[in-house]
Each structure stands twice: as C-alpha cells, then as structure tokens.
A protein has these predicted regions:
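Flavin-dependent oxidoreductase catalytic cores
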Residues: 30-397
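Intrinsic-disorder-associated, low-complexity terminal segments enriched in Asp/Asn/His/Tyr and depleted
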Residues: 5-6, 17
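Hydrophobic alpha-helical signal peptides and transmembrane signal-/tail-anchor segments
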Residues: 1-4, 10
C-alpha cells in the first residue's frame, strides 16, 4: 500500500498532457504479477497442488535393503524447496523380488516406512505434495545398477528369480537381460496383487498423499498388458480386456485399500513403439476402464516393453505430450504429461492449451532442483508463493 501512495505522488508531478499514461505507469510501477496456468493451483480429491509442476518418479539406486537413505531426503526434499507442487518418489518395489536392482527402494516392511516418514513430512513442510510410485519390475528385475552395465545378476552376484506373464526373456541374445522369467500361475498373480495392496497401506502410513501404480516401461503390469510380451491363453491373455485384467484387478484392490479422498494415478506406456504392440487407442480404452474403477489421473509415458522399443523411445518422447492430450480429451480423466519438457514457456503452453493437467519433469529437475522458481521468474510470476521464507527475504524479487 505504501508503494501505491509513493507511485501516485510521483505521477502527480507529471504534466497534464501525460495524464493519459497514468494507468500504464501505475501498472508498471506496481509490477503486478502475470497470470500463469502453470502456476495455478490444482485440486484433486482432497489435496491441492500449489502449481502444475511435478517431479517425475526417477530411480536413484541408492537404497539399502529397500530403505531410503539421506540421499533420498536430499533428492526429494530439494525439489520441494525448489518450488515443485508434486514430488513423486521413484519406482518403489512391493516386494524384494519386485526391485529392478538391489539398490532400489521398497515398501514391503515397516523399517522402510519409518525411513520415509521424515522425507514426506519435510516435503509437506515446504508446501509440496508427496507421491509415490508402486512397482514390480517383473522380467526386468534382478539387474545391476545402470552404471555397472544394467545386466541381469546371477545368484552369486546377488540376483534373484524373476517372473512375468510368460517365460520369454526380455533380450533373446543372452547378453543383457537374459534371464527367463517364471511363468506366473494364478496363485503368483494373487500374491503380487496382495503385495501391491500391502505396499499401498504402508505408503499411507509413510505419509504419502498421492499413489501411482506403475504400468509402463516393460515392468510387470505393463508386460501383462502388452501383446508383445503376454502370450498367455488363459483369462489373463488374448484380448485387450483379458490382458488388462491383471492391472484392473490390482487397481480395484488398491482402490479399496487407499483412502477414497486421496488421488490414485496409473502410469501407462501409451504406445509400445512397435508394430503389433499397444497403441494410443488401446490405452485410451484401458483408461476408461480404470476411470470406472476409481482412478483419478493417468501419467502418460511410452515404450519399454521390448528391446525394439529402445531406439524408438529416443525419437518419440516428445510425442508423449500429444498422447496425454488425446487421452485427456477422449477419457475425461486428468492427465500428466512427461518427456522432454524442459522450458518454462513450453510447460506453460501445455497447461494453458489443456494438453495435460500436470507436467512432470525428470532430467530438468536433476539439472536444476529450483526449476520451478526459475520458471516463475521467466514467466513473470510472483516467486514468493513457492519459496521458503528466508529465500523470499533475500532473493524473492
């Protein structure tokens, strides 16, 4: 208010012929913040995100026996301090056998819950919503960390038996992901579903407010859904509805265990990038089934079912935003867009043009945990709304 009076006093010294520029001068002097769709709040069920910027779930490979470490507090906490509205914890295994590597996160025991509680509490204290992605790696589990080659581990190297809808290895050249998965019987399917439910209950105890089911990138649930992998002839194979049965049954059980007032999200690979694989149209149909059983939002990624998708992914990630828009329009579900979203105006346009409800950033956030703050400045948005009080005081303008 004091600034306003000083501005008026200054303008009163202007000559009469300059009176017509007063409104423009007042607006300029007061530096009224711009309206931004990217920095508008979003309410989903009982939670409200302060903006539409989310941190994509990114494997860190830093857990010990599935237990989060100081690394995770730093990685996840810094993104909340940096201004993100949603911070999603990496693919978190529902069982020891569901991990990608021995260093992956887990939620199959209470020790893991206790390690996550201070992390989610800190994320909330900084104004962000903590989410977690629950996953089972399936035939892409029992691997070395990426910087160690990412190959399947033998038992002597600390590996474990893997499972899938069929007994086909991921790689057929016997070099990288060479292990043949155990063909899952109905009792194995039920066991994994129960593990997802138990992990969801632990996620709630750990303090998470958004839950994402990982059905993408060739991991277990996606491998059931994809005709490139699922060659079963029982009621879990064949038609799209049968191949979706594992995902749908698992989701129904999780929805019953996860509070109705909290959001439930599913990540889908919107295309397999391979002829004869899943298409965008297939996934839109799956999304309508998921909507009917209580899913609130779809996280739209792509690829990963087979080795043939590796090269296609690199050239097609930018198309995922359009897929999120198509799904959003056709299904009526909220969508998350992810993949090569790096620029502030790009993210603003995605939200403003109703292509997605949330943009998820991965590598951009690794490069710059303060990406949201810097984006706000670039877009002319008042930054203090997403900054801690000390930062507001010294660098908030």
């Amino acid at each position: 208010m004091l600034l306003f009076y000083h501005t008026i006093a200054r303008l009163l010294t202007l000559s009469i012929d300059r009176v017509m520029v007063w409104p423009i001068a007042i607006i300029s002097a007061l530096e009224i913040p711009k309206m931004s769709q990217l920095f508008s709040p979003l309410t989903v069920k009982s939670i409200t995100l302060r903006n539409r910027i989310g941190v994509a779930p990114m494997c860190q490979y830093q857990a010990i026996d599935g237990v989060a470490q100081a690394w995770h507090m730093t990685q996840l906490g810094s993104k909340a301090v940096g201004g993100a509205g949603l911070v999603i914890t990496e693919a978190t295994a529902v069982s020891p056998e569901g991990r990608i590597t021995p260093s992956c996160m887990g939620l199959w025991n209470h020790t893991q819950v206790e390690a996550l509680q201070p992390i989610t509490a800190f994320i909330k204290s900084q104004g962000a919503v903590p989410g977690v992605q629950l996953a089972h790696a399936g035939r892409k589990g029992s691997c070395a960390e990426p910087w160690l080659g990412g190959k399947h581990l033998t038992d002597a190297q600390g590996g474990w038996d893997i499972m899938g809808p069929a007994d086909q290895p991921f790689d057929d050249d016997g070099v990288r992901l060479w292990k043949a998965p155990k063909h899952m019987q109905h009792n194995h399917i039920e066991q994994v579903q129960d593990e997802f439910v138990a992990a969801a209950q632990r996620a709630l105890e750990a303090g998470y407010e958004l839950l994402e089911i990982h059905c993408a990138h060739g991991y277990l649930l996606h491998s059931f859904l994809s005709p490139l992998v699922n060659t079963r002839t029982d009621n879990y194979g064949g038609s799209l509805k049968n191949r979706a049965r594992m995902l749908l049954e698992t989701t129904i059980k999780i929805r019953a265990a996860w509070p109705q007032e909290l959001p439930l999200v599913v990540r889908l690979s919107m295309t397999d990038w391979v002829q004869g694989g899943l298409s965008v149209e297939d996934n839109i149909e799956v999304a309508t089934w998921l909507k009917a059983i209580g899913v609130d939002m779809i996280d739209c990624s792509a690829g990963g079912a087979t080795p043939a998708a590796r090269s296609a992914i690199n050239g097609g990630i930018a198309q995922q935003v359009g897929m999120a828009a198509d799904l959003r329009q056709a299904s009526g579900l909220m969508s998350m867009a992810v993949g090569e979203i790096t620029q502030a105006q790009q993210a603003e346009d995605i939200i403003a043009h109703h292509q997605a409800d949330i943009v998820l950033l991965a590598r951009a956030m690794l490069h710059d945990p303060y990406w949201p703050t810097h984006a706000a400045k670039e877009l002319g948005v008042e930054m203090s709304q997403i900054m801690p009080p000390l930062h507001q005081l010294f660098i908030g303008r």
